[in-house]
């Protein structure tokens, strides 16, 4: 009989998906990350638009952004995800990384981050959302932590001065080369690098040396005869293969030939080994990664740089120094800033802006928590385990090819056995380092246990049953250093390293320091050109996942599939956002991005036989890193004028381009301009440069005004760096970390930074890459997850809306303040971009009030000042970002208006011109209640100048700091701070 049952229709997966979408539309709306990221809600946006005279946000954007550069379509990116959904997807990607025990070394080690440090610094917005401590009175906590860092480095290295961190060990070594080149009395043009330095450091050195015309000689320090004149030398201590050498003889010979010597030294080893300063080294560099900082597939980590006092004014990077405030109390500040790029520009010691403050703070607190005894015990334990491992390997008939070592063994295994040993190790979840054929390296760290040694012995034995027990071998364990390389000098004797060893004490110390700093968890930080937007918690959470944090940067590619997926997606997304054909994620700071981009342009010209192209045109308004980076690339800087409206003077640009013709290499331009406007002539500007054979480098500092509205590659840029720590939500960390990846058009793609150390000499000869510009192939890889999360959660519409609201907020503030402070520059239809410049010069003329007075008075209102006196002296540049609510914008505007009124009171003779709230700001709690109050204004006017300060008061920790005194009496260690306190 026929089957009369109705046929069952099975819906297709596509049909089910459509039904689910329809059902989803009927449900109450899900939580939107965009609503969490934006400060002003829809109602507040309408109020702001009404103030500006616009009906819709689209109307404002149409008037503000030049039509010629508008992006004609929506960004083609994945749809936005919820916080929960994005975390789940990223967790799935992370799971594709394989977390092995990596004993590869090369300056990177697994480590133990003390939970009290992870929870209260790395995961604490009170630390990671602060800005570089230019406004020192409200950054005393961070500055003290950095002073601890400097002291720790000076003590461990035995040198007289240290900076507050650099980007990584490789670039720190390159900076040492540059310093040596600048101060050496030798007329030589060659720099010697020992062949047993870390290979990535050698690569970075070569990259840096090339455009400066420096010859890099890589050789054996044992046999180098100094018959070739050199200005400096770099040695690894201990060497990359683990060997510990006494470098005294080499250093003495170098000094006889007027060359400076840099030791790249592992700071943990220096608790046991004679420090570089005592060996005679002029400079010491290295990484503090193993002081509690996760591997993170290469970063971020805080490098250090220490040298002799005579070179302090030539040293790169930030230096924290001790000074005193207006009341005579000790106070900390950034010292010797006249060395730096934001002042010295093309004559600066380096293009480094900020570095790795958050990581330096963590490393310093690792030192504080453990103290000298704790650090020495960690080092001694690692060394003892290494010696124990060596004894066992000898019992297994393997040769050890170094006489002395700290934590790394160079094991002779034979060429035929090496592949099997490496494979056996991999089978047990262990990474070893292949050295020369027939040798492997094993580098131990503080996470290693005796069980790990058993696993290693079994790898080399080829079986589980060993002919010995660890206990049997212990009696043979002895220190493996000669007496003259065993440290005798004391270190970390200052009180701070000897009183916070319980978690309770350290927790309170960290809280005390944090409470002295104003970060985004207190109030807005409206710094122009800095984009201090929300760093959402969901974006930050994955940074500490072990699937990202415990991966060695030179782990086998098969173990890093998750990272490769992350990189590929992020590169594709950034390419779509900017219009560029290729992205390099290697630059680990904006300054590094600038350097990489200009190097790419230089290499492109060289590949075409146009080596004469060395002129870099830079607008007078440009950030100081621009000319500093150009000089580092061997270019000659030629400034271009700006017109009265703050735009690039097209006539002057044309004249300069014609003048230099076939010598023109590049134009560096920021867009929107550093004056806070969309220049309508940007397309014409790019065309002029291209007409004369130059390339256009765009500084991406102001990309937050472009995302979704226009794309730099579309209107003429050939290369651009992106500040992921601005536009794409990586936090500033109080002065780092940052990331500065670059995007390029297809004709420049071949010249991007190299990501492999394993290419042969033949391949490198064919390779057109500029080489490595950071020590790790993907820079500070672990924080790229932050930008991935931001883009994934915002989606294409959300990213565009964020840009629009950032422009709305800036124009709203400009409108509210224009009757009190002239808005110096405006663009299309009298509108600004995402920031605006307030002209404070009338206050100086009328009431003798300086920009500094306003900046310090804002602290009494609970605000960090906008960018001061840049790009125009006597002004403030304000950038509110899209993340600040209307209430917060109004509070800041009210504070600025109140300050204007205080200045007017001086002008009208109502307040003493010398003794007033502006000149005496900031006001500390101590200054209000200790001693007599002899000022002609009340304590309430001083400390509670606005209603919101009575609801919550942020107190500056010190009064106004005497900057001149600090530079004239330079003290850069805790010892100096203690002396001040005693005095």
Swiss-Prot record:
CDD domains: GDC-P. Belongs to the GcvP family. The glycine cleavage system is composed of four proteins: P, T, L and H. The keyword Isomerase does not apply. It holds the Pfam family GDC-P. It comes from Synechocystis sp. (strain ATCC 27184 / PCC 6803 / Kazusa). Its cofactor is pyridoxal 5'-phosphate. One of its GO terms (cellular component) is cytosol. GO terms for biological process: glycine decarboxylation via glycine cleavage system. This is Glycine dehydrogenase (decarboxylating).
């Amino acid at each position: 009989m026929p089957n009369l049952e109705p046929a069952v229709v099975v819906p297709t997966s596509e049909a089910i998906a459509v039904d689910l979408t329809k059902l989803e539309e009927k449900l109450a709306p899900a939580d939107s990350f965009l609503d969490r990221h934006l400060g002003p809600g829809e109602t507040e946006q309408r109020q702001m638009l009404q103030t500006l005279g616009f009906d819709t946000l689209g109307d404002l954007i149409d008037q503000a952004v030049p039509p010629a550069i508008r992006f004609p379509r929506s960004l083609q990116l994945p749809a936005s995800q919820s916080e929960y959904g994005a975390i789940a997807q990223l967790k799935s990607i992370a799971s594709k990384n394989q977390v092995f025990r990596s004993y590869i070394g090369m300056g990177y080690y697994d480590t133990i981050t003390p939970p009290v440090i992870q929870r209260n610094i790395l995961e604490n917005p009170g630390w990671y959302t602060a800005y570089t401590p230019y406004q020192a009175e409200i950054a005393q906590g961070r500055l003290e932590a950095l002073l601890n860092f400097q002291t720790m480095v000076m003590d461990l290295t035995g040198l007289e001065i240290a900076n507050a961190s650099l980007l990584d060990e490789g670039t720190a070594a390159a900076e040492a080369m540059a310093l040596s080149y600048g101060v050496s009395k030798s007329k030589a043009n060659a720099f010697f690098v020992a062949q047993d330095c870390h290979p990535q450091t050698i690569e970075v050195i070569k990259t840096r040396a090339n455009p400066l015309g420096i010859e890099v000689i890589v050789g054996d320090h044992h046999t180098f005869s100094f018959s070739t004149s050199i200005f400096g030398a770099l040695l690894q201590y201990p060497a990359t293969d683990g060997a510990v050498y006494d470098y005294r003889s080499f250093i003495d010979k170098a000094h006889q030939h007027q060359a400076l010597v840099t030791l790249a030294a592992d700071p943990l080893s220096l608790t046991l080994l004679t420090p570089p300063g005592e060996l005679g080294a002029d400079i010491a560099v290295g990484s503090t990664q193993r002081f509690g900082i996760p591997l993170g597939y290469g970063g971020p980590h805080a490098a250090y740089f220490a040298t002799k006092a005579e070179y302090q004014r030539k040293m790169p990077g930030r230096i924290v120094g001790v000074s005193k405030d207006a009341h005579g109390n000790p106070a900390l500040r950034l010292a010797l800033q006249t060395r730096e790029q934001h002042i010295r520009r093309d004559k600066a010691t380096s293009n480094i802006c900020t570095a790795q403050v958050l990581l330096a703070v963590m490393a310093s607190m690792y030192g504080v928590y453990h103290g000298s005894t704790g650090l020495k015990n960690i080092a001694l334990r690692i060394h003892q385990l290494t010696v124990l491992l060596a004894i066992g390997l000898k019992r297994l008939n393997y040769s050890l090819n170094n006489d002395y070592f700290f934590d790394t063994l160079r094991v002779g295994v034979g060429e035929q056995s090496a592949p099997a040993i490496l494979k056996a190790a991999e089978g047990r979840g262990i990474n070893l380092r292949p050295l020369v054929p027939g040798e492997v390296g094993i580098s131990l760290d503080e996470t290693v246990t005796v069980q790990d040694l058993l696993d290693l012995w079994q790898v080399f034995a080829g079986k589980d049953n060993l002919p010995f027990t660890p206990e049997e071998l212990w009696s043979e364990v002895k220190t493996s250093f000669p007496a003259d390389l065993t440290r005798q000098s004391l270190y970390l004797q200052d009180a701070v390293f000897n009183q916070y060893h319980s978690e309770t004490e350290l927790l309170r110390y960290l809280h005390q320091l944090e409470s002295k700093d104003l970060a985004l968890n207190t109030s807005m930080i409206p710094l122009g050109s800095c984009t201090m937007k929300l760093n959402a918690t969901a974006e930050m959470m994955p940074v500490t996942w072990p699937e990202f944090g415990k991966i060695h940067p030179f782990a086998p590619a098969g173990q890093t599939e998750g990272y490769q997926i992350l990189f590929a997606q992020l590169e594709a997304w950034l390419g779509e956002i900017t219009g560029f054909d290729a992205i390099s994620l290697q630059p680990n700071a904006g300054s590094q991005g600038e350097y990489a981009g200009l190097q790419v342009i230089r290499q492109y010209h060289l590949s075409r036989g146009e080596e004469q192209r060395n002129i870099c045109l830079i607008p007078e308004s440009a950030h100081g890193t621009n000319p500093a980076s150009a000089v580092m690339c061997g270019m000659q800087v030629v400034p271009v004028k700006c017109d009265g409206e703050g735009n690039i003077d097209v006539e002057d640009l044309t004249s300069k381009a014609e003048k230099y013709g076939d010598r023109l290499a590049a134009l560096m331009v920021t867009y929107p301009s550093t004056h806070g406007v969309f220049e309508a002539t940007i397309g014409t500007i790019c065309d002029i440069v291209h007409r004369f054979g130059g390339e256009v480098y765009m500084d991406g500092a102001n990309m937050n005004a472009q995302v979704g509205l226009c794309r730099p590659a579309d209107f003429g840029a050939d290369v651009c760096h992106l500040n992921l720590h601005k536009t794409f939500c990586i936090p500033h960390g109080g002065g780092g970390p940052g990331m500065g990846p670059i995007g390029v058009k297809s004709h420049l793609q071949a010249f991007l930074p190299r990501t492999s150390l394993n290419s042969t000499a033949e391949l490198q000869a064919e390779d057109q890459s500029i080489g490595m510009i950071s020590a790790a192939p993907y820079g500070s890889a672990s924080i790229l997850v932050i930008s991935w999360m931001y883009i994934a959660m915002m989606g294409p519409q959300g990213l565009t809306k964020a840009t629009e609201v950032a422009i709305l907020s800036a124009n709203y503030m400009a409108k509210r303040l224009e009757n009190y402070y002239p808005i110096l520059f405006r663009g299309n239809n009298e509108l600004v971009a995402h920031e605006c410049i307030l002209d404070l010069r009338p206050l100086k003329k009328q009431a003798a009030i300086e920009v500094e007075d306003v900046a310090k008075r804002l602290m009494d209102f609970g605000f960090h000042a906008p960018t001061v006196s840049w790009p125009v002296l006597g002004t403030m540049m304000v950038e509110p970002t899209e993340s600040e609510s209307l209430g917060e914008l109004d509070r800041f505007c009210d504070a600025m208006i109140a300050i204007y009124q205080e200045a007017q009171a001086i002008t009208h003779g109502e307040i003493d011109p010398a003794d007033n709230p502006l000149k005496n700001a900031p006001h500390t709690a101590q200054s209000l209640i200790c001693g007599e109050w002899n000022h002609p204004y009340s304590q309430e006017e001083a400390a509670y100048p606005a209603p919101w300060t009575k609801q919550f008061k942020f107190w500056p920790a010190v009064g106004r700091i005497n900057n001149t005194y600090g530079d004239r009496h330079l003290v850069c260690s805790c010892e100096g701070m203690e002396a001040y306190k005693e005095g």
